[in-house]
C-alpha cells in the first residue's frame, strides 16, 4: 500500500477549570475542546511481515521511548494478530509546549490512521482507551468531535459550537504541563458547574494567572491581544488566542503582530479534520489534504 497523509489538527481549550486534586495526584477538570483547521501532517507507509517502525525527521531531544507517535504505534502493534510496521514522516507545524495539542494530536492520528491502514479493526472506544495511556487529551482527538470534558479529561460530551475564527499567538517560551499542575500556587477550587451554566457564563483558564507569573512572554502576548479582542490562554500554555466572527477580522489583527512573534489564523471546527479524513478514506479509499 502506498503512503498516505493524515492531518493532526490543533485544539483550543475555550475554558479550563481546575476543580480539585485527587488522591492519586491527578486533577479534576472541566474544559471545552474545539478543533482548528490547522496542524501537523503525518504520512504513513505500511510495512508487512515486520514490526519495524521508523519516524522521520527525528524530534531533537525526544528518544523513541518518549515519542508519542512511536508509543502510539507500538500500543496498536500489541493488538495485532500478525507483524506489521510503518515508515512514518512527520510534517511538524504545531509548537511543542504550546497547549494546542501537538503531541496528543500526533498520537491520536497515529492510532486512527494505522488502525485503518493495518486493518486492525479496533473500535473508537478501544482506540480511546489506548489513547488515554498516552495522555489525557488523546481521546478527544481520537473521537474527533468538539467536546465538554470532565474528570481528568476522559469523560467527553460532544457539543456543537457556533462558527468562529481564531487568532493564535505562540510566545517564545515552553510551558511544561506537569510543572503547572505540580505548582502549589495553582488554583484548584473552582466549583463544578453544569454544562449549560458554563456555556452561558464567563470563560476563564485557571492556569493562566500562574503561567503569566512564571512566563512573562505569555503575559506580554495576552496583554497585546487584549487590545483587540477578549483573549485567553489555551491548556497550560504557552499559546494564547482570541476569537473573531470572521477570517478577515482575525487576519487584520495578525498583520499587526509585533515582529518576531509567531501566530496563525484558523477556523474552529466541531468535527476534527482527522475524523473528516477517516470518513473520506472509508468512502473513497484515499486521504487527501
Swiss-Prot record:
GO BP: isopentenyl diphosphate biosynthetic process, methylerythritol 4-phosphate pathway; terpenoid biosynthetic process
SUPFAM superfamilies: GHMP Kinase, C-terminal domain (SSF55060), Ribosomal protein S5 domain 2-like (SSF54211)
Pathway listed: Isoprenoid biosynthesis; isopentenyl diphosphate biosynthesis via DXP pathway; isopentenyl diphosphate from 1-deoxy-D-xylulose 5-phosphate: step 3/6
Active site, renumbered: 11, 137
Pfam families (UniProt xref): GHMP_kinases_C, GHMP_kinases_N
Catalytic activity: 4-CDP-2-C-methyl-D-erythritol + ATP = 4-CDP-2-C-methyl-D-erythritol 2-phosphate + ADP + H(+)
InterPro entries per record: GHMP_kinase_C_dom, GHMP_kinase_C_sf, GHMP_kinase_N_dom, IspE, Ribosomal_Su5_D2-typ_SF, Ribsml_uS5_D2-typ_fold_subgr
Keywords linked to the UniProt accession: ATP-binding, Isoprene biosynthesis, Kinase, Nucleotide-binding, Transferase
Chain sites annotated for binding ATP: 95-105
Assigned EC number: 2.7.1.148
GO terms of molecular function: 4-(cytidine 5'-diphospho)-2-C-methyl-D-erythritol kinase activity; ATP binding
Gene3D superfamilies found in the cross-reference section: 3.30.230.10, GHMP kinase, C-terminal domain
EC top class, as a word: transferase
Function: Catalyzes the phosphorylation of the position 2 hydroxy group of 4-diphosphocytidyl-2C-methyl-D-erythritol.
Family: Belongs to the GHMP kinase family. IspE subfamily.
Name this polypeptide is given: 4-diphosphocytidyl-2-C-methyl-D-erythritol kinase
Source organism of this protein record: Aeromonas hydrophila subsp. hydrophila (strain ATCC 7966 / DSM 30187 / BCRC 13018 / CCUG 14551 / JCM 1027 / KCTC 2358 / NCIMB 9240 / NCTC 8049)
Amino acid at each position: 500500500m502506498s503512503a498516505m497523509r493524515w492531518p493532526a489538527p490543533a485544539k483550543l481549550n475555550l475554558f479550563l477549570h481546575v476543580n480539585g486534586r485527587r488522591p492519586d495526584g491527578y486533577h479534576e477538570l472541566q474544559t471545552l475542546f474545539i478543533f482548528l483547521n490547522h496542524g501537523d501532517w503525518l504520512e504513513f507507509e505500511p510495512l508487512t511481515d515486520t514490526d519495524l517502525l521508523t519516524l522521520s525527521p527525528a524530534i531533537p531531544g525526544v528518544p523513541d521511548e518518549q515519542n508519542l507517535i512511536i508509543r502510539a504505534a507500538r500500543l496498536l502493534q500489541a493488538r495485532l494478530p500478525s507483524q506489521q510496521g510503518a515508515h512514518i514522516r512527520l510534517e511538524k507545524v504545531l509548537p511543542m509546549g504550546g497547549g494546542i495539542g501537538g503531541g496528543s494530536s500526533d498520537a491520536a492520528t497515529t492510532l486512527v490512521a494505522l488502525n485503518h491502514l493495518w486493518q486492525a479493526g479496533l473500535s473508537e472506544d478501544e482506540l480511546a482507551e489506548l489513547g488515554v495511556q498516552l495522555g489525557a487529551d488523546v481521546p478527544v482527538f481520537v473521537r474527533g468531535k468538539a467536546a465538554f470534558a470532565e474528570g481528568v479529561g476522559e469523560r467527553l460530551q460532544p457539543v456543537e459550537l457556533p462558527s468562529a475564527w481564531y487568532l493564535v499567538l505562540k510566545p517564545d517560551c515552553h510551558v511544561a504541563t506537569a510543572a503547572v499542575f505540580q505548582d502549589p500556587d495553582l488554583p484548584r477550587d473552582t466549583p463544578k458547574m453544569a454544562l449549560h451554566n458554563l456555556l452561558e457564563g464567563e470563560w476563564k483558564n485557571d492556569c493562566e494567572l500562574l503561567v503569566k507569573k512564571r512566563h512573562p512572554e505569555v503575559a506580554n502576548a495576552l496583554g497585546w491581544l487584549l487590545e483587540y479582542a477578549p483573549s485567553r490562554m489555551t491548556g497550560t500554555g504557552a499559546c494564547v488566542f482570541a476569537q473573531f466572527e470572521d477570517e478577515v477580522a482575525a487576519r487584520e489583527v495578525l498583520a499587526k503582530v509585533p515582529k518576531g512573534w509567531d501566530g496563525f489564523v484558523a477556523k474552529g471546527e466541531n468535527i476534527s479534520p482527522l475524523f473528516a479524513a477517516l470518513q473520506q478514506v472509508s468512502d473513497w479509499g484515499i486521504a487527501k489534504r
